[in-house]
């Protein structure tokens, strides 16, 4: 498999969005929702050339008549038939390439079950006939994208958050922590607190509206209690949002109450530690000699770290937990929404990486378990 003349494909399958494109590019060509929609009612649209399923943006735009499903939950693929549909859509409709002509780099969640990486490998070689493939851990790619090989990545997407300490390019599995609290939970929480104000959002279609409100208006307060007092005493923090039907709603303290759940999961009725404490706990599980390097390289990654104010708050909270003399640095690259994909694009275009691919020949010889030997 000579990777010189053929461009590799990089696909980052997130719980909420799929990011896909070509190795060597500086941004993904295609970014679309990781959803598969099926009609709720059969045959209401006569002559529409009805399909039995829709993927991505098309599913999103027809959401009023569809039931939407996410095949990736908490970062891990749970529905392989739908996942195959998403990959098919990625190759043929979004990138318009023949998968049998390009090596494919896929990403996976930290601590992804072994059976899952095998299944991914099997589908790529057997269903799509790719000449070569590789599976890389998402957080490691984010760190590469920030130009580092050592640091701790706090990756928070739509379905799951992880803190992943990485030393000299290797993730330290014993210190990786997973937090099942991410963008989708924050959207649900915002739906709940808006409902308390008398606005009703219930369907899967309305959830997408609330997600948009969250992405456009929410922010992280540096001091939550103080922000609550400010919000109570003045309307300075209020913003208005126009719904698709023209109704205008006003949103006040919900703007920062929503992402506050990242730091106080008890808001969602969860007993776990917040993202700051989880980051600290991850660092404490590492060898004492490398902690200084981790504290000095805390890299934020994923769409749920895009809230304004999150880096300052993280700095404040970690400083309170860490030894008083410790230098703490939070790195929040502006492109962090796509840093996993960007890291994959960098990795797959390195000349030194070309011997790392799992080739079709190796797969035919060893079967799906080859992935554990070659992808670390």
Swiss-Prot record:
Q: Does the keyword Phosphoprotein apply?
A: yes
Cellular location(s): Cytoplasm, Cytoskeleton
Provide this UniProt record's keywords sorted from A to Z.
ATP-binding, Cytoplasm, Cytoskeleton, Hydrolase, Methylation, Nucleotide-binding, Phosphoprotein
Q: What name has this protein been given in UniProt? A: Actin, plasmodial isoform
- Tell me what reaction this enzyme catalyses: ATP + H2O = ADP + phosphate + H(+)
Q: CDD domains, per this entry?
A: ASKHA_NBD_actin
For this chain's UniProt record, which GO biological process terms are given? phagocytosis
Residue list for modification Blocked amino end (Glu): 2
Query: What is the superkingdom listed in this entry's lineage?
Result: Eukaryota
Per the record, its GO cellular-component terms are: actin cytoskeleton; cytoplasm
Primary location: cytoplasm
Q: GO molecular function: any one? A: ATP binding
The source organism is Physarum polycephalum
Range of residues in the leader sequence: none
Spell out which residues are annotated as carrying Phosphothreonine. 202-204
- Site note Not N6-methylated applies to 85
Q: What does this protein do?
A: Actins are highly conserved proteins that are involved in various types of cell motility and are ubiquitously expressed in all eukaryotic cells.
Q: Which family does it belong to?
A: Belongs to the actin family.
What EC class does the entry list?
hydrolase
Recorded hits in Pfam families, A to Z, give: Actin
Cite the SMART domains for this sequence: ACTIN
Q: What else is known?
A: This protein is the only actin found in the cytoplasm of the plasmodium of Physarum polycephalum.
Q: Which residues carry this modification: Tele-methylhistidine?
A: 74
Q: Which post-translational modifications are recorded for this protein?
A: Phosphorylated by actin-fragmin kinase (AFK).
What are the EC numbers? Answer: 3.6.4.-
